[in-house]
Amino acid sequence: MTAPQNGTGNGLQTGADLAVRSDSPLILALPKGRILKALAPVLTRTGIEPDPDCLTESSRRLRFGTSDPNLDVVRVRSFDVATFVAYGGADIGVCGADVLMEFDYPDIYAPLDLGIGGCRISVARPKTMVEDPATGQSRLCVATKYPTIARRHFASRAINAEIVHLNGAMELAPTLDLASVIVDLVDTGSTLRANGLMETETIAHVTSRLIVNRVALKTRPEEISALIERFRAALNTEEAA
């Protein structure tokens, strides 16, 4: 994705850039798919009601109004939420901790763990492989969509990870000799098992986080702080139930 060239040389928007939108609705970026479904009850408790088709997978719209005239929702791929927020396309968003670990955007502040979408980033290898291919090795071929996380993890074991960057069908990589192991997001593990793989290590446990653009928080502090508190209250309501 090519970042918009606004305000700074690296494409990140400055306070002056975001101030242009200061009278416009705040933009909340939400991920498509299972996280959006899990998020729906949280949104209800915050009092945020997006247009009905926002929660419909078949809808081709990407931007939606809400019950709050000062808040619009955009629906994007889960891996892209952090990019939209970091580059100022959205003021606030919901994304997995895996995305924050992978990209580590300095312009993102993550004030709340929403506790939904629980899963884990794991290393997996074929069940037929008796020994861990990483044992005693200084180099290892890894298929993943998380190159930063994978390199960091194996570097901690003094292993140089050679990355095969895939965005899907990760489980095929070891069986087709593209890689010795994979690093992927795992929920139940059923897809791994169905493809003859087994988990060997858990790198990190992952839940969804509320994230905020730091510049937007400075330029529209009252609005964004109020929105954060609505999410915080919604989580407290759930815990008290």
Swiss-Prot record:
Alphabetic keyword roster: Amino-acid biosynthesis, ATP-binding, Cytoplasm, Glycosyltransferase, Histidine biosynthesis, Nucleotide-binding, Transferase
Taxonomically, what lineage is the organism?
Bacteria, Pseudomonadati, Pseudomonadota, Alphaproteobacteria, Acetobacterales
Q: In which pathway does it act?
A: Amino-acid biosynthesis; L-histidine biosynthesis; L-histidine from 5-phospho-alpha-D-ribose 1-diphosphate: step 1/9
Q: What is its EC number?
A: 2.4.2.17
| Top-level class of the enzyme under EC nomenclature | transferase
Localization of this protein: Cytoplasm
What PROSITE patterns does this protein's entry cite? ATP_P_PHORIBOSYLTR
Q: What does this protein's UniProt record list under function?
A: Catalyzes the condensation of ATP and 5-phosphoribose 1-diphosphate to form N'-(5'-phosphoribosyl)-ATP (PR-ATP). Has a crucial role in the pathway because the rate of histidine biosynthesis seems to be controlled primarily by regulation of HisG enzymatic activity.
Q: Where would you say this protein principally sits, based on its record?
A: cytoplasm
- What does the entry's domain section say? Lacks the C-terminal regulatory region which is replaced by HisZ.
Quick one: a GO cellular component term? Answer: cytoplasm
Q: Point out the coiled-coil segments of this chain.
A: none
Q: Which CDD domains match?
A: PBP2_HisGs
What subunit structure does UniProt give?
Heteromultimer composed of HisG and HisZ subunits.
A Pfam family this protein belongs to? HisG
List the catalysed reactions: 1-(5-phospho-beta-D-ribosyl)-ATP + diphosphate = 5-phospho-alpha-D-ribose 1-diphosphate + ATP
Classification via InterPro entries: ATP_PRibTrfase_cat (IPR013820), ATP_PRibTrfase_CS (IPR018198), ATP_PRibTrfase_HisG (IPR001348), ATP_PRibTrfase_HisG_short (IPR024893)
Q: What is this protein called?
A: ATP phosphoribosyltransferase
Query: An example of a Gene Ontology BP annotation on this entry?
Result: L-histidine biosynthetic process
Specify the domain of life of the species encoding this protein.
Bacteria
**What protein family does this chain belong to?**
Belongs to the ATP phosphoribosyltransferase family. Short subfamily.
